[in-house]
């Protein structure tokens, strides 16, 4: 897996909350690439946890950018699912979706990879890293700091 290509495979124009956004990997120290789909029950279970993590991580300053790569079967599903997400997403039907799935040999979803902002793979099992530390009442700043510190040490 050639992780340095991640920043080249993500299209410059991504979908954000308020329309099209120009992608810049340097906007945060860490870049997460999240492969998921509306129709996938494990994804729908993990997405709220990741959203909570993302919001706590970025509360004071931007530490993490996430790019969603959809496996949704229709644009309606994609739009409904991305409507619940605070991060960026590759537009539905964009060729980058297949290119990213192929490059990272995605076998199943949800799949969450974490890179530094230069494209170096930091955590191939970022879903497990985030999910295994999920407290009952949601993430605290301390829990998130612990995970960020783990990633920073790599």
What are these regions (language model features)?
Residues 29, 36-39, 108:
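Short pre-active-site segment immediately N-terminal to redox-active cysteine/selenocysteine motifs
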Residues 7-31, 56:
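A short beta-strand-turn-helix
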């Amino acid at each position: 897996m050639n992780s340095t290509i991640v920043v080249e495979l993500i299209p410059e124009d991504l979908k954000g909350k308020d329309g099209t956004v120009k992608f810049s990997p340097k906007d945060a120290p860490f870049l997460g690439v999240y492969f998921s789909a509306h129709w996938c029950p494990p994804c729908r279970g993990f997405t709220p946890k990741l959203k909570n993590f993302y919001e706590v991580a970025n509360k004071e300053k931007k530490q993490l950018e996430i790019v969603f790569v959809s496996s949704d079967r229709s644009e309606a599903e994609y739009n409904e699912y991305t409507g619940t997400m605070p991060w960026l997403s590759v537009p539905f039907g964009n060729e980058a979706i297949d290119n990213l799935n192929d490059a990272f040999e995605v076998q199943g979803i949800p799949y969450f990879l974490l890179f530094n902002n230069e494209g170096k793979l930091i955590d191939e099992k970022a879903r497990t890293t985030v999910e295994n530390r999920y407290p009952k009442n949601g993430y605290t700043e301390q829990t998130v700091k612990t995970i960020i510190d783990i990633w920073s040490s790599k």
